[in-house]
């Protein structure tokens, strides 16, 4: 082999030649379908090129970390009123909707499992003085207020804390925005006469039957609003990842 000490032009990997032939033989016999994990249009396109037959997990929180979105996310988290929180969510809606439009277009009728916001909110908050300063200029809060709020939201054991569907119950407007983005993206794809994608909405970290009922009712409520606003019918699945002890 060779040791290269500098950057060199690279080639995009592709399935070709003998490997492509071998995989085509496997395709003619296999019974399983393979989906991908993807949260961006670019990753989704790459996965389709490699033969993915749907998205098994689209983690929506990863869409929030882009530079043009993270400030609005932090503004939403630090909002003291529902009105202020909704203003911040209104800034995020177009971004998330556009992501879903592109993902649904690329998947072209294949199933897409979308997991609603899962991590605890402190994971989105600023980690250094520059980020705190940027957030201060947007929210009007001083650095000490932001640091104090960050400490309040910090979860010592996030797996058992305020995350997943428990966030959706405490702040339903967050999940309402995400569901609206999904359904409005479906409507846009329908207007473009694209193949209909069946989104599978995953409610994260459900512990009880009551939690899934609350979240299911929220999803259905948003669906009806978007259907009425656009005079159309929307098809989807809603559920959760369950662990069964045998």
What spans do the regions from the language model cover?
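Conserved alpha/beta-domain cores
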Residues: 18-244
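Phosphate/pyrophosphate-binding betaalpha-module
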Residues: 5
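C-terminal, low-ordered peptide segments at domain boundaries
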Residues: 12-16
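Conformationally flexible catalytic loops at phosphate/diphosphate-handling active centers
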Residues: 1
């Amino acid at each position: 082999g060779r040791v290269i000490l500098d950057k060199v032009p690279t080639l995009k990997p592709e399935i070709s030649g003998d490997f492509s032939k071998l995989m085509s033989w496997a395709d003619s016999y296999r019974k399983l379908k393979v989906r991908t994990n993807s949260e961006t249009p670019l990753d989704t396109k790459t996965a389709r090129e490699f033969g993915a037959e749907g998205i098994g997990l689209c983690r929506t929180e990863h869409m929030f970390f882009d530079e043009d979105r993270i400030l609005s996310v932090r503004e939403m988290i630090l909002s003291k009123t529902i009105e202020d929180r909704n203003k911040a969510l209104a800034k995020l809606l177009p971004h998330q909707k556009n992501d879903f439009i592109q993902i649904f277009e690329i998947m072209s009728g294949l199933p897409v499992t979308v997991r609603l916001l899962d991590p605890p909110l402190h994971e989105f908050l600023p980690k250094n003085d520059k980020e705190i300063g940027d957030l201060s200029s947007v929210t009007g809060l001083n650095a000490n207020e932001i640091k104090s709020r960050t400490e309040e939201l910090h979860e010592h054991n996030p797996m058992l804390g305020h995350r997943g569907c428990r966030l959706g119950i405490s702040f339903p407007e967050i999940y309402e925005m995400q569901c609206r983005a999904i359904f409005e993206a479906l409507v846009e794809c329908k207007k473009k006469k694209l193949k209909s994608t069946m989104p599978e909405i995953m409610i994260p970290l459900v512990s009880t039957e009551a939690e899934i009922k609350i979240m299911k009712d929220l999803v259905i409520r948003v669906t009806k609003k978007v259907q009425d606003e656009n005079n159309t019918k929307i098809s989807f699945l809603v559920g959760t990842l369950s662990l069964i002890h045998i």
